[in-house]
Each structure stands twice: as structure tokens, then as C-alpha cells.
From Swiss-Prot:
<dbReference type="GO" id="GO:0000287">
    <property type="term" value="F:magnesium ion binding"/>
</dbReference>
<keyword id="KW-0808">Transferase</keyword>
<protein>
    <recommendedName>
        <fullName>1-deoxy-D-xylulose-5-phosphate synthase</fullName>
        <ecNumber>2.2.1.7</ecNumber>
    </recommendedName>
</protein>
<keyword id="KW-0479">Metal-binding</keyword>
<feature type="binding site">
    <location>
        <position position="176"/>
    </location>
    <ligand>
        <name>Mg(2+)</name>
    </ligand>
</feature>
<comment type="similarity">
    <text>Belongs to the transketolase family. DXPS subfamily.</text>
</comment>
<feature type="binding site">
    <location>
        <position position="176"/>
    </location>
    <ligand>
        <name>thiamine diphosphate</name>
    </ligand>
</feature>
<dbReference type="Pfam" id="PF02779">
    <property type="entry name" value="Transket_pyr"/>
</dbReference>
<dbReference type="InterPro" id="IPR005475">
    <property type="entry name" value="Transketolase-like_Pyr-bd"/>
</dbReference>
<dbReference type="InterPro" id="IPR029061">
    <property type="entry name" value="THDP-binding"/>
</dbReference>
<feature type="binding site">
    <location>
        <position position="146"/>
    </location>
    <ligand>
        <name>Mg(2+)</name>
    </ligand>
</feature>
<dbReference type="InterPro" id="IPR005477">
    <property type="entry name" value="Dxylulose-5-P_synthase"/>
</dbReference>
<dbReference type="Pfam" id="PF13292">
    <property type="entry name" value="DXP_synthase_N"/>
</dbReference>
<dbReference type="GO" id="GO:0030976">
    <property type="term" value="F:thiamine pyrophosphate binding"/>
</dbReference>
<feature type="binding site">
    <location>
        <position position="283"/>
    </location>
    <ligand>
        <name>thiamine diphosphate</name>
    </ligand>
</feature>
<feature type="binding site">
    <location>
        <begin position="115"/>
        <end position="117"/>
    </location>
    <ligand>
        <name>thiamine diphosphate</name>
    </ligand>
</feature>
<dbReference type="GO" id="GO:0016114">
    <property type="term" value="P:terpenoid biosynthetic process"/>
</dbReference>
């Protein structure tokens, strides 16, 4: 099994194969991807769809000297397997294992780290221009999907690249939804080879030189050329950006891909190759339902993904989806917006029931936020369902278009905190810090399912931009209450009181997901625990009261410490004039790798045992007593 694949330790081995061996290799590679993902979980449909394209790129181009940038990056498992990581695939997305995305520190073949969409053309153009300036003769290649091509950044890069006439840049549009092109056929293949050939490029340049003295004739020739292309492909748009458009071609046909790429390799200037692929190619279950098989957990390939038993605990995403439908039922002004994350954000049912108030704007986070602002000016109640990591992409719009104008937009921020297998690129570590400094913002962090529901309802009542953050995955098991209750603005609650004598009294000020582990630490240490609820406005009165009645304060959040919720508490403490020793616990000043979320939180000292350990070492150990007494004497 995998007789050919076992001989490939790097692309140099691949390039030594006979062309006739490449399709059997593709079959083995596809089977290996399926087997690997079924054992570890991960992205499947997109990787099954890029097998032949990956083989062709590494076969034709001299990687890693020639650079390949994979947009989004979740389709790079075949690339990883062919570039020396075949025997590490068992550790894919596991703690201390290889990443599910390209990572420069992992391999020289991962030329640029990706995970968010639409960045590849900008990066590849920078590489192409950089190579020119360095006097290096290498190709830079961006592989981008048709979904990612909807984002403005991709077109900004295309606009810039089109005037770089000598750059050895190739943009490959991996069209896996047939959303742009007509069906692929023999005529398309023939035209693609013709357009990528040196004769065509030279002939076109020669004709333009000859006809430059007769502009009307030249314009006629250009129109005829566009018409010829337009019969089979929508080339005009990409040609207008200054690219030579080639395709579409079948992205699973190595006999089309390889000669076309070989022709392109001999050209200079920006080239645009349109390939059509099928998500889930070669695995019928994934072909039939590429969404279901987009990012599965472990499963049996022979049986396929089986329906999971209904979990005892709702996920926070489900809580959001149910809340949104309930609010929309009550109020016709409620509008739901998602940047291409309908399933992930829990909006499937909302789309079915309120189709005229559901807007999937595509991979366009900046537009989503400003679009919501526009809706708010017309008296509607827009709710933007967005992952924490993707809200980063719309920071200027959050400030300039929504907060500056104090528009009542609700931001339902999913995947707050650590997200597990997707790793640092998708961690929701920074939203509290980057939102807290924005005037007019109200920010809440949910500690359980019902609190999440009531916070979302509270947010919808506010006259200003308001955010509610909640984590990925299952909740704590708390039942949601159908009736809505508005939470008093900027008010936390004490969930546990200490019985310790003076000198040993510790108060833990916990935010969101950190309330549960803080309560565990509070039980172990007999400490007071407060559920702060609001990051902005922070409950300054509660901070002061806890400072006045306790000897030590500890803030705990599942977000970056610098500038986060703990900083808000310390600022309130300074304002109060009550001075107490404070520990700020949260995510450290580093990017947290992929792995099991519970294990990662424990590694960061943010489980119950870790919180108790930090408090004990800092405030309650004999050494801490000595240090504290020394400070008091001083």
C-alpha cells in the first residue's frame, strides 16, 4: 500500500517520477489524506480536491526555490505529505504535532503562514517583487479559492500586481464551486494550452507592436481576442487587472495541468490560471456533501460520518442561534449578518425562517461591519455573528464606521478564547483588549448558556455598539430560560464569599469562561469569587468593595492579559484609591499552539488547579507571607 507515496520524501523525489506514474501517485495520495484525516479529524473536502493540483505544482516548479502560497491554508495536507511530513500526519492538529495550516517554522516549503483568507496574492506579489530586487530568478505562486476571491484584499493585490509587468507571478484560482466558469471541456483545455504557450504570448506582443501605429485596428484585434476568450471563460475581468488569463482547465486532469504550468513557467509578468476542482474528489460521500465533510472529527471512511447523539449540553453557538430566532420572531427589525460562516455561527435555522432578514456577505468582514452600521442608521437592529479571530479583520470599520457614530450594532463574538485544533491563527485571544479601548463600546463575557442568552438580549436593547463574547463548544449544562431578562448595565455578581480571617482573604474577579474554574479554585482556597460579567463598563463599585474587604485580588480571563479585562479592574482599583496586591491571570504574551483546549488552558494555568496554584504561590505560601511582611515594614 502507498508504494509510490512511500518513495516521496520531498518534491525532488516527485520530479524524478515518470509522468505516467503521477496519476497512480495521486490515487495513493488521496487515499492517504482520507485515511489520515479520518484518524485525527481535520479539513477533508478541500484537501481531496487539491491532490492533482498539488502534485502538478511541485512537479513543474522548483520548490522551495519557487514559492507557493496557499490561501486560507486548510487545503495543504497533500502539500505537507509531499514535502517531508508524510510520517507526521498522525499528529496533525494534535498537541505538539504538525499544524493544519502552512507554517514557516515547520518547513521551508511553507513559504508563508496562512489561515485567514484572501492574503495569498499580496504575499506572493511581495515575494515576486522581492525576488526581482534581489536578482533571484524564481516564480511566486498564489493558490486561492473562488470564495476567497470575493474579499477586497484579493482584488487590491490583483490591482497592484497587474502593473508589475516583469514579476514572475502566477495566481491560480481554485474554483471548486463552478461559481465563475462554465463546464470544462476539450475546447477549454485546448484554449488553455494555446493561451499559456510562448507562441501566443509572443504573437500577441508582436501584433500589438505592429498595430500600435493604427489604434483603431489594434482595438478591433483586442475585441476579437476578448470575444474568443469570452465564448468559454469570463477572462475580461482578470485581463483588465493586467493579468494574462488562462483557462479554465480541469484541476483533476494532470495531462492538462502539467503542460499548462510548464508553458506558464516560461512566461514573465502576472499570469492567472483558472482551474476547476471538486471538493471531496474521489470520496463519494464528501463529493455528495462537501459541507458535512469540510472539517469532520474522527470517523470510519467505510461508513462515513454518523449523526452524533444529541449532546446533553447545548453549544454556545446553538444558544446564539436560538436566541436570534426568538428575537426575530418578536421584532421585525432584527437582522442577521454573517461573513460566510452560516453553519459555524449557528444561523442555519435563522436563514430558513427569516430569509429576507438574513445576509451572508461572503468573506468580507470589513463590509459586514459597515453594512451593519448602515442598517442601524435606518432603524434596524443588526446582529453581526462573527468569530473573534475574524473581527480583527474589520477593526477600522468597528472604530470608524460603527463606534465613532455610536450606532446600535450587536456583535455576537463566537470562538472567544482558545479554540483547540485550529491553533494560534484562529484563537480569540485579543477581542477584549482591542475592543475595550474603543469609546462607546459595551462588552460582556458570558459564563454559561443562560447568561449568554440574556446578555445577547441585553445587547439588543442598547443604544450603542455592544459585544457579547462566548467560547466554542458545549456550555456548562445550565438550562436557558425562555423569558428574557435584561442584565443591569455594568453590574457583576458575587458567586461565592470567603470565610477566611483578615490577612488571608482573596477575591477572584472572573470573566466569562473563567468563572467555573475560578469557583473551583475558590472552593479549594476558600476565596471570594465574582462573576464580573461586563468588561466595559467594568463594575468599578464591585471592584472597590472587594478591594476594601479583601487582602488580595486576582483577575482571571480567557484572553490576553495586556490591555484586557484584568487591566480594566486594575484601572478601576487605581481610581478607587484602594491599594491591594493584584495578580492578573490570562493568556500569556505568546501565540498558543494547537491542541486540546482543556490541556492548553491547564498549560496556561487557567484551570481550577492552575488558578489555585498561582494564588497559593503568590499570596498564601510561607514565602509569600515573609515577602508581604517585608513590604508592610518597608
Amino acid at each position: 500500500m502507498y508504494d509510490l507515496l512511500k518513495t516521496i520524501d520531498d518534491p525532488a523525489d516527485l520530479r524524478r517520477l515518470d509522468r505516467r506514474q503521477l496519476q497512480p501517485l495521486a490515487d495513493e495520495l488521496r487515499a492517504f489524506v482520507l485515511d489520515s484525516v479520518s484518524k485525527t479529524g481535520g479539513h477533508l473536502s478541500s484537501n481531496l480536491g487539491t491532490v492533482e493540483l498539488t502534485i502538478a505544482l511541485h512537479y513543474v516548479f522548483n520548490t522551495p526555490n519557487d514559492r507557493i502560497v496557499w490561501d486560507v491554508g486548510h487545503q495543504t495536507y497533500p502539500h505537507k505529505i509531499l514535502t517531508g511530513r508524510r510520517d507526521q500526519m498522525h499528529s496533525l492538529r494534535q498537541y505538539d504535532g504538525i499544524s493544519g495550516f502552512p507554517r514557516r517554522s515547520e518547513s521551508e516549503y511553507d513559504t508563508f503562514g496562512t489561515a485567514h483568507s484572501s492574503t495569498s496574492i499580496s504575499a506572493a506579489l511581495g515575494m515576486a517583487i522581492g525576488s526581482q530586487l534581489n536578482g533571484d530568478d524564481r516564480f511566486s505562486i498564489a493558490v486561492i479559492g473562488d470564495g476567497a476571491m470575493t474579499a477586497g484584499m484579493a482584488f487590491e493585490a490583483m490591482n497592484n500586481a497587474g502593473v508589475s509587468e516583469d514579476a514572475k507571478l502566477l495566481v491560480i484560482l481554485n474554483d471548486n464551486d463552478m461559481s465563475i466558469s462554465p463546464p470544462v471541456g476539450a475546447l477549454n483545455r485546448h484554449l488553455a494550452r494555446l493561451m499559456s504557450g510562448r507562441f501566443y504570448a509572443a504573437a500577441r506582443a508582436g501584433v500589438e507592436r505592429v498595430l500600435s501605429v493604427a489604434p483603431p485596428v489594434l482595438e478591433l484585434a483586442r475585441k476579437l481576442e476578448e470575444h474568443a476568450k469570452g465564448m468559454v471563460v469570463p477572462a475580461t475581468l482578470f485581463e483588465e487587472f493586467g493579468f494574462n488569463y488562462i483557462g479554465p482547465i480541469d484541476g483533476h486532469d494532470l495531462d492538462s495541468l502539467i503542460p499548462t504550468l510548464q508553458n506558464i513557467r516560461e512566461l514573465r509578468g502576472p499570469q492567472f490560471l483558472h482551474v476547476v476542482t471538486k471538493k471531496g474528489q474521489g470520496y463519494k460521500l464528501a463529493e455528495a456533501d462537501p459541507v458535512l465533510y469540510h472539517g469532520p472529527g474522527k470517523f470510519n471512511p467505510a461508513e462515513g460520518i454518523k449523526p452524533s447523539p444529541t449532546p446533553a449540553k447545548k453549544t454556545y453557538t446553538q444558544v446564539f442561534g436560538e436566541w436570534l430566532c426568538d428575537e426575530a420572531e418578536r421584532d421585525s427589525r432584527v437582522v442577521g449578518i454573517t461573513p460566510a460562516m452560516r453553519e459555524g455561527s449557528g444561523m442555519v435555522e435563522f436563514e430558513k425562517r427569516f430569509k429576507d432578514r438574513y445576509y451572508d456577505v461572503g468573506i468580507a468582514e470589513q463590509h459586514a461591519v459597515t453594512f451593519a452600521g448602515g442598517l442601524a442608521t435606518e432603524g434596524l437592529k443588526p446582529v453581526v455573528a462573527i468569530y473573534s479571530t475574524f473581527l480583527q479583520r474589520a477593526y477600522d470599520q468597528l472604530i470608524h464606521d460603527v463606534a465613532l457614530q455610536n450606532l446600535p450594532v450587536v456583535f455576537a463574538i463566537d470562538r472567544a478564547g482558545l479554540v483547540g485544533a485550529d491553533g494560534a491563527t484562529h484563537a480569540g485571544a485579543y477581542d477584549l483588549a482591542f475592543m475595550r479601548c474603543i469609546p462607546n463600546m459595551t462588552i460582556m463575557a458570558a459564563s454559561d448558556e443562560n447568561e449568554c442568552r440574556q446578555m445577547l438580549h441585553t445587547a439588543l436593547q442598547q443604544p450603542n455598539p455592544t459585544a457579547v463574547r462566548y467560547p466554542r463548544g458545549a456550555g456548562t449544562g445550565v438550562a436557558t430560560v425562555k423569558e428574557f431578562t435584561e442584565i443591569p448595565l455594568g453590574k457583576g455578581e458575587v458567586r461565592r464569599r470567603t470565610s477566611q480571617p483578615e490577612g488571608k482573604r482573596v477575591a477572584i474577579l472572573a470573566f466569562g469562561t473563567m468563572v467555573a474554574p475560578s469557583l473551583a479554585a475558590g472552593e479549594e482556597l476558600d476565596a471570594t469569587v465574582a462573576n464580573m460579567r461586563f468588561v466595559k463598563p467594568v463594575d468599578a463599585a464591585l471592584v472597590r468593595e472587594l478591594a476594601e474587604t479583601h487582602d488580595y485580588l486576582v483577575t482571571v480571563e480567557e484572553g490576553c492579559v495586556m490591555g484586557g479585562a484584568g487591566s480594566a479592574c486594575v484601572e478601576a482599583l487605581m481610581e478607587s484609591g484602594v491599594i491591594r496586591p493584584v495578580i492578573q491571570l490570562g493568556l500569556p504574551d505568546q501565540f498558543i499552539d494547537h491542541g486540546d483546549p482543556a490541556k492548553l488552558l491547564a498549560q496556561c494555568g487557567l484551570d481550577g488547579a492552575g488558578i489555585a496554584k498561582s494564588i497559593r504561590e503568590r499570596f498564601l505560601s510561607p514565602a509569600a507571607d515573609v515577602a508581604d511582611q517585608a513590604k508592610r515594614v518597608a
